[in-house]
Amino acid sequence: MPKRILSGVVTSDANDQTVSVSVERRFTHPVLKKTIRKSKKYRAHDENNTFKKGDAVRIVECAPKSKTKRWEVLQAAEV
């Protein structure tokens, strides 16, 4: 099964080797036919503390690194 890759924005870089990434998804509501935006936060592993708050990044699924970390930062995303 392929690993999922998501794009988002770093919302926090306070912890060592960890960033919080907010990923937004858009979908059309089935009844209202209106575009809805939902966001979810993921904690991702950042080995070298490279990324700072506000950076656009791509994250990929990985084996669990800690209690809450299941994602790794893959690369910086183009804005």
Curated annotation (Swiss-Prot):
Keywords, sorted A to Z: Ribonucleoprotein, Ribosomal protein, RNA-binding, rRNA-binding
GO molecular function: rRNA binding; structural constituent of ribosome
Gene3D superfamilies (alphabetical): Nucleic acid-binding proteins (2.40.50.140)
A Gene Ontology biological process term: translation
Domain of life: Bacteria
UniProt xrefs under CDD domains: Ribosomal_uS17
Family annotation (InterPro entries): NA-bd_OB-fold (IPR012340), Ribosomal_uS17 (IPR000266), Ribosomal_uS17_bact/chlr (IPR019984)
SUPFAM superfamilies (alphabetical): Nucleic acid-binding proteins (SSF50249)
This protein's GO CC annotations: cytosolic small ribosomal subunit
Record family assignment: Belongs to the universal ribosomal protein uS17 family.
Protein purpose: One of the primary rRNA binding proteins, it binds specifically to the 5'-end of 16S ribosomal RNA.
Oligomeric and partner information: Part of the 30S ribosomal subunit.
Name of this protein: Small ribosomal subunit protein uS17
